[in-house]
Structure formats: C-alpha cells, structure tokens
Amino acid sequence: MLDLNLGILSTHNEDEDCKVPTSIFIQEEDSINPSNDNLSLITFGILKRNVEILPPPPPPPPPPPPSENELSGPGNEWLDLSSMQRNKQETLVMKKKSRRGPRSRSSHYRGVTFYRRTGRWESHIWDCGKQVYLGGFDTAYTAARAYDRAAIRFRGLQADINFIVDDYKQDIEKMKNLSKEEFVQSLRRASASLARGGSKYKNTHMRNDHIHLFQNRGLNAAAAKCNEIRKMEGDIKLGAHSKGNEHNDLELSLGISSSSKVRILEPADYYMGLNRSVTSLHGKPLPGYLPITEIKPLKTVVASSGFPFITMINPSSLSLSCFDP
C-alpha cells in the first residue's frame, strides 16, 4: 500500500542516505508565522522509499521417503509386494547369457547347421575369431557330438556343450595327446569316412559292390577251373588245372603250350606264328614264322638349289629276312 502521509523534512536534521525521513507535524503556530528561519519542505514519504524486488520463494522440499517401519505397516503391504516384483524382473533381465551366442536356427543343437545344397549336417566352432570346420555328418546328433568334443578340447570342461561332460570321459583322455590341428583333422577324417560308407579305422571302407568277393571264398577256385586270369603275388598265370592236361606251365605271352622240356624264350621266338597250319589265298602254305621287313634309314641330302630334302638310300634294295628257329 502507498504511504500518503505528509511529512516535513528538515534540511539540517535529514541525511540524504536515510531511508526513513524525520517528519514534523505542522502546527498551527508555525504555519501562521512565516518568518521562521528554518525552512521546511513538504514531501511524500513514498518518494524516499527504496523499493527492493525480491526473488520468488523456493519451492517446498519433497516429502521424505517412507521409512522401513511405515513400509512394514498393515496399511502399506501393497508397496512391499511391488518392490518384490521389481526385484524378480531385474533378476530375469540380469540372468547370465551364453558366451557363444544363440543356438543355430536350423538345428536345436549348438554349433550344428543344416545345408540344403549338400543335404548334410555340418559342425563349426569359433576359435580366436575364426570359424573352424569340423566336418559334415549324416545326422544332427553326430554333428553335435563332434562339436562337443571340439569345444572341450578348445575351451576346457567349462565350455557350453550340447550334452553332459561325463559322456566324453574316454574322448578327453585321447585329446590330451593331440594338438588342436590334429584333433580337427581326426574329426574331419571321421566325417568323411562315414559319408563314404567307411569305418572308423584308417584306410578302411565299405563297398557294397565288393562284398561278394569276401563272402564266398570258393570264387577263386571256380575262376581257376574256368581258365580265368587272376592276380596272385604279382605274377599273372593261367590257372588251367584239368585232369587231361599234362602241360600246366602255359605262357600268357603267346597263349600256346610249351613242350615238355622247359626252355628260355629268345627275342626271335616272339615272332613265331600262332598257328602253323595257316594257308594263303593261293593255296600255298605259309612259313611258320612271320617275315620281318628291313627298311633302310633315311638320309638328308642337300639339293643344287641349296634347300635340303629327305631321301631314302637304295629304295629298291628292300630285302626280306626271316628268323629260323
């Protein structure tokens, strides 16, 4: 509110810096006597008042949180239940996740993937930022077992595997003597041999088209009776063992039987005919051996023009020579 009270300020008793002036009420006597030496001024008190603008008051402080006794009271049981639910949700969110990423989409086993192009289940494992191929298998179970062995070998017994560690006790003992590279190669060999119908042993494979060779041992004897050629100890022989045949030492080079006396063949004997009773078209018997034609060698001759050409020495002197045993 404005102060409209009138006041008389004295020039002697008033200070300029004074906020509240000294007011003297006007008396009737002073107002009548104009000869008063002390001059006075009539002023409003509002002119000398210093108006100070204050900041707005601060907001009230928030209410203090409820104490433990208040939370445990009968009227605030719902607060306790909500806090318990929050703790359960936090525990579910903070649950330990797998270190090796999510499971494969094509298989419910870890580290196993199905490839439609090959139609097989392939197993992979990550080691030092690289994906290591463990092999391709016919079933997802065998691929998962291969992944578990590799995970135990690479990361120890605390690795994330598909089955129980106790199932691999025998494999763990074998892994100790093998390096990582050797162990991976053994898994790949096992997968490749199983794909070809092989065995777990090295260089052993199952071939359906060769099973009959091992089931019937009498085939070798039957082949010998039918004069079939078979391989035995690196030598090729003709197994003709009949009762009426007296000469069993047949030579396969010419296919004819030798005499009773065994002799060593010479190079000229290989030019003998297969049948001595062969006749020619004119009715004349041919010799019992094949003729050998001797051809003179060729010789390079220089022509008069300076260009060389090839000619035959004595082309008319071709002769026929025969070997006579």
Curated annotation (Swiss-Prot):
Its main location: nucleus. Gene3D superfamilies: AP2/ERF domain (3.30.730.10). Belongs to the AP2/ERF transcription factor family. AP2 subfamily. It comes from the Eukaryota. GO terms for molecular function: DNA binding; DNA-binding transcription factor activity. CDD domains: AP2. InterPro entries: AP2/ERF_dom, AP2/ERF_dom_sf, DNA-bd_dom_sf. Induction: Repressed by miR172 after photoperiod changement. GO terms for cellular component: nucleolus; nucleus. It is found in: Nucleus. One of its GO terms (biological process) is ethylene-activated signaling pathway. Coiled coil: none annotated. Residues 108-164 bind DNA. 'Schnarchzapfen' means 'snoring cone' in German. The keyword Nucleus applies. Probably acts as a transcriptional activator. Binds to the GCC-box pathogenesis-related promoter element. May be involved in the regulation of gene expression by stress factors and by components of stress signal transduction pathways. Repressor of flowering. Residues 54-67 have a biased composition (Pro residues). This is AP2-like ethylene-responsive transcription factor SNZ. PANTHER family: AP2-LIKE ETHYLENE-RESPONSIVE TRANSCRIPTION FACTOR, AP2-LIKE ETHYLENE-RESPONSIVE TRANSCRIPTION FACTOR SMZ-RELATED. Keywords: Activator, DNA-binding, Ethylene signaling pathway, Nucleus, Transcription, Transcription regulation. Residues 52-79 are annotated as: Disordered.
